[in-house]
Amino acid sequence: DALGASKAAAFDLSAGCTGFVYGLGVAADMIAGISSRRTRYGRNEGGIALVIGSETLSRITDWSDRATCVLFGDGAGAVVLRWNASEGGILATMLRSDGSGRDLLQLPAGGSEEPASHRTVAERRHYLRMRGREVFRFAVRAMPDGVMEVLERSSLEADEIDLLIPHQANQRILEAAGKALNLAPDKVYSNLEWYGNTSAASIPIALCEAADEGLIQHDDVVVCVGFGAGLTWGASAMRWSVPLPAEPRTAWRRGRYAALQSYAWVRSLVRRFVRWLFSRGVKEP
């Protein structure tokens, strides 16, 4: 609504800490399909998708549980995908799940299996619970396997990775994954010391910061990999095709974006007012 994207499809996709990789894969496939249909019918334009990873884990963190409360943070990050017929961009994505590990990382109550009640609240069952050792063993196996699968699909080798962007779970997991892939430490990006584990937001935040720091150059091979509750895991290999250096954010561009945002806000306000009038029995114009 605030963006003014009133004709765009919008939906939530939940896959725990792997959510951003899932969203990336789904969005890439959708805009590729939309763009191919447009090309077939003579419309020379590609699809565009905005993929957002966002989480507020502080709402479900038990601050009396020292095993989990020091790990998590809140955050949000986003990327824009644009269809392009040339080589590059997202090369391959893999998505997996294993429901047998659902109890390793979960919110015990509040869902359909155990609805909220006075008892569940009193027993503090609406907070995140994690079996850390089992999650660690799963992560250090699943992340390298996911990376190798997307590399194979992309006809690439591990030594061709310019930068690995893993889900920022904990430093030991990141180091173990990098070691399993024989990657130098400087090829495994980490910003854990600033934000902690921000779930689905961790990969887009890390990707954005790595690009801002100049760690990703045009035509670099970048692999994003994540794992999370479910259990879920996934990876996406891409060849960085964003033109660098990026277009500078001049005062005119900032003013233009601010004006567009203000226009979208006013339009939304008018539409809501019209709907309110209609609900009061006034005929819609």
Question: What is the predicted role of each segment?
Answer:
Residues 1-4, 51-57, 112-120, 173-185:
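Acidic-glycine-rich active-site phosphate/pyrophosphate-binding loop
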Residues 6, 13-37, 140, 144, ...:
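Claisen-condensing/thiolase-fold acyl-transfer catalytic domains that form or cleave C-C bonds
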Residues 8, 45-48, 220:
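Nucleotide donor/acceptor-binding cores
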Residues 10-12, 51, 90, 188:
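Conserved beta-strand scaffold positions in the cores of enzyme catalytic domains, especially
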Residues 14, 49-55, 72, 81-82, ...:
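Short beta-strand segments
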Residues 28-36, 41-76:
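Flexible, glycine-rich active-site loops centered on histidine and acidic residues
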Residues 53-54, 59, 98-104, 171:
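Acyl-CoA/ACP chain-elongation machinery
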Residues 65-137, 141, 145, 239-285:
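Condensing-enzyme catalytic core mediating Claisen C-C bond formation in acyl metabolism
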